[in-house]
């Protein structure tokens, strides 16, 4: 069987729980070979974001050229893009290199609430990037920002917003319902073929740093093995639930700790 080569385009996390570091751990845990393009150097830890150094857009583009000119990339995950010019650079290179099977994690805020995407970049993300990607994975605040609409408070409002996002041109939308006040944590998958609800009990842990990064990376790593996004999401969510269930066995940081990416091994 041909090995999967997976690319992550994202910012860093020195504490290892989110961003590029979480993506590469996820790829490895799920049997994919990980490549990376860095968009921002982020001084952050389990307590929050202290500082962000944005990489020059031309250098982001150069990194992408280096990878795509040499490595067969089977699947790509996009995370933190930080600002308008970086969004534009990534969108242009995806088009130039005819990149397919792209998962976009619409990263706007860190778990701590610190901003990771400038407000001016949201429109560029919406217009230039969304039509090129295969799947987006917004939580409810991110979906509201993309739609310039109020935050969904009910599952019915969540459904309406998911359908509106799908109409923007991407192949599929996985709306994450973790912000709903529900004992279950419902997610909804929207595709051209239909809609699918995923529900699982909330895992009782405070250590959820990097869950969005980890889920989107898992979706990217697993997609080439499955026939559709529904099958992919089922496996990715089950794997993430196990990583969350083992998060408390780690002892990382004083704040919101990471999930356990390698729970199957140690």
Label for each model-derived stretch:
Residues 3, 54, 230-266:
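Charged C-terminal helix
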Residues 30-35, 196, 222-236:
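Phosphate-handling active-site elements
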Residues 1-2, 8, 19, 183-198:
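Acidic-glycine-rich active-site phosphate/pyrophosphate-binding loop
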Residues 119-195, 235:
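Conserved phosphate/ATP/ADP-binding segment of small-molecule kinases
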Residues 144-145, 206-229:
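Short, small-residue alpha-helix embedded
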Residues 2-8, 28-111, 115, 262-265:
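Conserved N-terminal subdomain of the carbohydrate kinase-like
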